[in-house]
Amino acid sequence: MSIQKNAYVVMDTETSFRNGLVFDFGWTTMDKRGNVLGSADLNFLDVICKEKPYYINKIAGYARRQRKAVHKVTTFAVGQRLFNLHIQHLKTAGYRVILCAYNAGFDCRVLAGTSRAFGCGKFLRHSVELLD
């Protein structure tokens, strides 16, 4: 029996004022040695068009970061697919996937809510562990 390596997916979300929909989602995945296994920083244009972001005053900063290719602009459905493909890749490579966040319960709840609001079904398509 081999021991699984841990992959820590450190994630963060930013939400809108009105309905708490996620308009900004980012993650960095590392192993226990700090090697980066993947990362993304996504802005969801479909959510921004529908909702007033909580950090509306930061939108200009997001635009600058998008021009520098730090943030990627996409839709929520594409972001969800990218995240789940990343998780699938980690699991296929034999990693034990652990989601981490300052308030992981909140992040998971608002991601699931945004997924429902945009008709994308369950946000997470793979079983993972949660570290809050």
Segments predicted by a language model, with ranges:
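Short, conserved catalytic or adaptor-binding loops enriched in Gly and charged residues
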Residues: 1, 29, 121-125
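Conserved non-catalytic scaffold segment of RNase H-like nuclease domains
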Residues: 2-9, 13-105
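Short, surface-exposed, charged/polar-biased interaction segments
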Residues: 31, 48, 120-121, 132
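Residue-level detector of functionally special positions within alpha-helical transmembrane segments
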Residues: 58, 129-132
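Substrate-recognition/cap helix-loop segment adjacent to the acidic, metal-dependent catalytic center
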Residues: 105-130
